[in-house]
Amino acid sequence: MEEIEELIYKYALQNAYKHGGKAQDKAVVSKIFVERPDLRSRAKEISEIAKKIVEKVNSMSIQDQERELKEKYPDLLEEKKKEEPEKKTLPPIKVEGKFVTRFAPNPDGPIHLGNARAAIISYKYAEMYKGEFILRFDDTDPKVKKPIKEAYDWIRKDLKWLGIKWDKEVKASERLEFYYSMAKELISKGFAYVDTCSEEEFKKMRDASKPCPNRLKSAEDNLYLFEKMLNGEFKEGEAVVRIKTDLSLPDPSQRDWVLLRIIDVKKNPHPITGDKYWIWPTYNFASALDDHDLGITHIFRGKEHEVNAEKQKWIYNYMGWKYPYVEEFGRLRLEGFMMSKSKIRTVLEKGVSIDDPRLPTLAGLRRRGILPETIIETIITVGLKVSDATISFDNLAALNRKKLDPIAKRLMFVQQPKEFIIELSEPIRAKIPYNPSKPSEYREILVNPGDKILLDAKDAEEGAVVRLMELCNVTISGNKLIFHSKTLEDAKKLNAKIIQWVKKDEASNVEVIIPDPNEEKPPISGYGEKEIGNLKINEIVQFIRFGFVRVDNKIDNKVTVIFSHE
């Protein structure tokens, strides 16, 4: 039996080290059965043993786990290095000559994980082919998808956080005169007309594949009507400019769709132009014209734009332009999170901030402690899949943990603190590395006989012998911690749990916010070691045996952190 326990211990250590100090008993058992298939007949027994050993391994600090691996199973550390996957890259695409792409967000809300996909893919391809990347704000709807003035900066900040640099910035709302001139050109060539029918009348005729009367008028007559629109002689809903398509197309939405419409900007002023302009282009008209005028060669966007591409090609064909190369992909969801931009906007209107860590916005994920590299790698891994994809937060957290493990400080935090007096024959100085990957960087904590020590109540079992991480082994007796022995080897012989601790007279007051998109959870209060009080806002660290947290605020001796993940 000792041989089996040793085997389980070995793979539990390896699994814990690979996953930020937390082994999974099922994964360990699977590994055992691969090496020892003869043990499958004893599956229940092996699983019970594994559960106990994994619990013991998980109580160790990651420093102790690594030390054990180095001393007893160094080959498993080498195996971890060999298992590192190759860096993910996007697949090659067709490129002929110049490469220019763009990201065209509507600044009607913050960017979330799903719509960041187009930005990241577009930028990474521009990098790959040494091309140009343009940020174009698609802000031509001051009524329905009304831009938010602050959202322009929200988007810029998010892109910079992702490491995205743009070569040019364009606001569609500042290009209205250009759209008007192109509308005149299309009307003069007989490719567009001014429709003065009511929406209901046009729908009846469109559904019957019949033309609106103005469609049959001369270019001169329609140009005259367009001038009247520009002069403000029509009100909202009284006239629109339509492109001439095929009235027999099977999809009614493709028949003579709207290029320009009138919006009452006295009621719905634009955040940039106010009430200066009242004729506004539709998404498809502005996008088609800008993509050509800006020299866009490649477009990366969601497959929901398939219908829009068909509409835009009418303009390209009429003008004799070449349509850009397009790659379309499915929607991307973060499981359990609200991904609808309109729903997020509704929540924001109720006073929730864009960086609320319960939201899947980039600002919310950033505040939660998710790294930009994690977002980018996630998007690149999903790539250009046409099918919709759903990412679990657990998978996002696993990737984030992998990136944080080698760099984040490991610090001690105690929730549900219980106070003890430590009995020692002499002072002991604990020397604790911040991270096992950099043993030369450490802090020292001097503990004197009679000092008050805080332990987590769940670790404070009466009569138990426990190891105070990197300090010594003690027996819990009433309100005292009585010195038992010094070394880690002694603790192993006793099967002693290795626990975090905090020296009371140096303790930092800590509040942990637990973000949950589905329910309101009260914050966790506790105490942390002195070093926590020295952390900077936005610093991400690991609370040992608790999880990763990001420092959100510091007031006096109170440090507020947001829980990221285990």
UniProtKB/Swiss-Prot annotation:
Keywords linked to the UniProt accession: Aminoacyl-tRNA synthetase, ATP-binding, Cytoplasm, Ligase, Nucleotide-binding, Protein biosynthesis
Family membership noted in the UniProt record: Belongs to the class-I aminoacyl-tRNA synthetase family. Glutamate--tRNA ligase type 2 subfamily.
GO cellular component terms, semicolon-separated: cytosol
Primary localization: cytoplasm
HAMAP family associated with the record: Glu_tRNA_synth_type2 (MF_02076)
GO MF annotation, one: ATP binding
Name of this chain's protein: Glutamate--tRNA ligase
Keyword Protein biosynthesis: yes
Enzyme Commission numbers on file: 6.1.1.17
Motif ('HIGH' region): 105-115
Enzyme class: ligase
Function: Catalyzes the attachment of glutamate to tRNA(Glu) in a two-step reaction: glutamate is first activated by ATP to form Glu-AMP and then transferred to the acceptor end of tRNA(Glu).
Location of this chain's protein in the cell: Cytoplasm
Superkingdom of source: Archaea
